[in-house]
């Protein structure tokens, strides 16, 4: 179509609009645009269905029987010719009448689903067959108990792909099977699942070596009832207000019972002690039927049981020495440990326990007495009395090796009362303890200045 024809068509359209201007404005005007009525829509659909289906009977509310101008076609007369073998097939309906066959009434509902199989054989309820035909198989439930059967009037489909796989290839040849799985979109390298009884462990299970701190390497295949040493690292101590509710639980999976505690038993402890000598008791013995706190308090009443806890003229320490860990909530005693932190705490605790007299001073005041002048003795005594009352600003012990700083430190706190926020600043002595409370502390060493250049 050239440009001249396009121009002529445009002119014809303009002439048509000018001649029918009133009719067009009445029908398609902006004020008259609306959908057709339901009656017009229904009649249009009936006309369309009557033309496509070719029915001669009158539809309710539609065309009449006498209207013979419409082309009539029957679906049952349609036929298709296969381009491959020239066979002519007949289109059949994929639905079945109710109560088809000799049965009068079928109580169970019949669900029919037509499925096309491309495996080269008929899919029946008893496995694959060697039939060369492919066809339509419908899965039925109710009448045929869910078995897969082949429709009797199934025909060859011309558009179906041909995949010729013999029975031997399907059963034995894995290469053909993988190729077939690849063409169908399945995973050809899938590993089949094998059932395995997990309740029976393997006889040759590997032995997993676990290392217990201070005890060396233990093997996992040791019997659960065998007694063994348990380190403090594998023990959790839970305390409460009720003494009878105290429990000692183990993280050690080989512990026989939650009421047995076996810690650091030496060969000397396993031998029975003599009647006349000192009883060689240890926390490593079995505790049953009583709370651990009562048992430990009974041992504290005997000065000979815990060396270093009695007066200065007590007997010679036993070997191995029993030591008390001050970091535990309960006074839990155990044999020696190689942890450097525990040894440092034990060293500090032993120095404090050596000064049991009334006139004795804590070790962290010795350096203060040596460094101050005689005129500050009263201040030092006041500091000592403050330390005896265990005030919160007690400086750190000398055994830690951290020097005590003299002076002031500036502290800043952001306060909030629910309506406004403000910042407060003040100075505290450097020897006082840092606390989250926004308040001023007192000097604990007696050598910090009363004011600094920040205080003004």
Curated annotation (Swiss-Prot):
Effect of residue 304 to A: In strain: Isolate NV/MY/99/VRI-0626
KW Magnesium (keyword) present: no
Listed InterPro entries: Paramyx_V_Zn-bd, Paramyxo_PNT, Soyouz_module
Name of the encoding gene: P/V/C
Positions contributing to Zn(2+) 1 binding: 408, 427, 452, 455
Bias kind Basic and acidic residues: ranges: 63-76
GO BP: any one term: protein stabilization
Family stated for the protein in its record: Belongs to the paramyxoviruses V protein family.
Binding-site residues, Zn(2+) 2: 431, 443, 445, 448
Keyword field: Host cytoplasm, Host-virus interaction, Inhibition of host innate immune response by virus, Inhibition of host interferon signaling pathway by virus, Inhibition of host MDA5 by virus, Inhibition of host RLR pathway by virus, Inhibition of host STAT1 by virus, Inhibition of host STAT2 by virus, Interferon antiviral system evasion, Metal-binding, Phosphoprotein, Viral immunoevasion, Zinc
Residues where Phosphoserine is found: 257, 350
Region (Disordered): 53-92, 265-324
Listed name of the protein: Non-structural protein V
Reported function: Plays an essential role in the inhibition of host immune response. Prevents the establishment of cellular antiviral state by blocking interferon-alpha/beta (IFN-alpha/beta) production and signaling pathway. Interacts with host IFIH1/MDA5 and DHX58/LGP2 to inhibit the transduction pathway involved in the activation of IFN-beta promoter, thus protecting the virus against cell antiviral state. Blocks the type I interferon signaling pathway by interacting with host STAT1 and STAT2 and thereby inhibiting their phosphorylation and subsequent nuclear translocation.
Annotated GO MF terms: metal ion binding
Alphabetized Pfam families for the sequence: Paramyxo_PNT (PF14320), Soyouz_module (PF14313), zf-Paramyx-P (PF13008)
Subunit structure: Interacts with host IFIH1/MDA5, DHX58/LGP2, STAT1 and STAT2. Interacts (via N-terminus) with host UBXN1 (via C-terminal UBX domain); this interaction inhibits interferon-alpha/beta (IFN-alpha/beta) production. Interacts with host RIGI regulatory protein (via CARDs domain) and host TRIM25 (via SPRY domain); these interactions prevent TRIM25-mediated ubiquitination of RIG-I and disrupts downstream RIG-I signaling.
Protein location: Host cytoplasm
Annotated GO CC locations: host cell cytoplasm
Further details from the record: The P/V/C gene has two overlapping open reading frames. One encodes the P/V/W proteins and the other the C protein.
Annotated effect of mutating residue 206 to L: In strain: Isolate Malaysian flying-fox
């Amino acid at each position: 179509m050239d440009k001249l024809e396009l121009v002529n068509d445009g002119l014809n359209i303009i002439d048509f609009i000018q001649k029918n201007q009133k009719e067009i404005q009445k029908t398609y005007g902006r004020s008259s645009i609306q959908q057709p009525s339901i009656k017009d829509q229904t009649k249009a659909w009936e006309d369309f269905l009557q033309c496509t289906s070719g029915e001669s009977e009158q539809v309710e509310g539609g065309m009449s029987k006498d209207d013979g101008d419409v082309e009539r076609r029957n679906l049952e007369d349609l036929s298709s010719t296969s381009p491959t073998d020239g066979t002519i097939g007949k289109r059949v309906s994929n639905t079945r009448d109710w109560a088809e066959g000799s049965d009068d009434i079928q109580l169970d509902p019949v669900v029919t689903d037509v499925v096309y199989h491309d495996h080269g054989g008929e899919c029946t309820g008893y496995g694959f067959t060697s039939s060369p035909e492919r066809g339509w198989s419908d899965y039925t439930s109710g009448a045929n108990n869910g078995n897969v059967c082949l429709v009797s009037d199934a025909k060859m489909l011309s558009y179906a792909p041909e995949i010729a796989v013999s029975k031997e290839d399907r059963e034995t040849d894995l290469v053909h099977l993988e190729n077939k799985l690849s063409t169908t979109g399945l995973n050809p390298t899938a590993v089949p699942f094998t059932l395995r009884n997990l309740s029976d462990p393997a006889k040759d299970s590997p032995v997993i070596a676990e290392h217990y701190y201070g005890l060396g390497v233990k093997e996992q295949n040791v019997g659960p009832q065998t007694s063994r040493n348990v380190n403090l690292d594998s023990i959790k101590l839970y305390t409460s207000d009720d003494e009878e509710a105290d429990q000692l639980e183990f993280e050690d999976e080989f512990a026989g019972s939650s009421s047995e505690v076996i810690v650091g038993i030496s060969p000397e402890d396993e031998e029975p002690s003599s009647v006349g000598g000192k009883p060689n008791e240890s926390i490593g013995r079995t505790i049953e039927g009583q709370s651990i706190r009562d048992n430990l308090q009974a041992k504290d009443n005997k000065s000979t049981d815990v060396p270093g806890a009695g007066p200065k003229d007590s007997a010679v320490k036993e070997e191995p020495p029993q030591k008390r860990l001050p970091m535990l909530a309960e006074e839990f005693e155990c044999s020696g440990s190689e942890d450097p932190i525990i040894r440092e705490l034990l060293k500090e605790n032993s120095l404090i326990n050596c000064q049991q007299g009334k006139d004795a001073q804590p070790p962290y005041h010795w350096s203060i007495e040596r460094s101050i002048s005689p005129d500050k003795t009263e201040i030092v005594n006041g500091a000592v009395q403050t330390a005896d009352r265990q005030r919160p600003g007690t400086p750190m012990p000398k055994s830690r090796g951290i020097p005590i700083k003299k002076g002031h430190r500036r502290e800043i706190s952001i306060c909030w009362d629910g309506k406004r926020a403000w910042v407060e600043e003040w100075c505290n002595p450097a020897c006082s303890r840092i606390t989250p409370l926004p308040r001023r502390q007192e000097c604990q060493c007696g050598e910090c200045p009363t004011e600094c250049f920040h205080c003004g």
